[in-house]
């Protein structure tokens, strides 16, 4: 992250051959692009990333070799998520209408100059899609055993609860803010998102 060994360039060449107009979007040190082929109907976007996490130990094949053995492709990023992006390109070549791809080089790292910045650009240029397919791999036990309909995000919040300090000898004069906070936390935990 964010190096992609030329993966975005390969994609850009392939998408231009399919009639896509490509806009390169560099934010900081991060290369991203938005590719669009306008057409009738709703706007469908495929979103993904070309960066990978460091390979770590224990590889049976070179992590950056892209070896194929018994119909299985071995290499860092083959599943997360260059395989998904290859499926996007295959689908985009067959899907009629208004299709785009949002490709970022900053998903595995800090993720501040990738999708968030490209979405801001898309908003500014009137290119927010009606639908988006994110090809991030998800599974319970075996790749492809589940399909998720959304991606859970995260929320950071500061909750302030007022109390009243007091002496241990006079607990009836004190208000413990933690005790007041517990029902609010229970309500938040019970709320289905």
What is each model feature region?
Residues 20-21, 73-80, 169-177:
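Short alpha-helix boundary/capping segments
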Residues 32, 98, 154-156:
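Broad gene-expression machinery/nucleic-acid interaction feature
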Residues 43-102:
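Active-site metal-coordination/substrate-binding segment of hydrolases
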Residues 1-55:
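N-terminal helical capping/dimerization or prosegment-like subdomains
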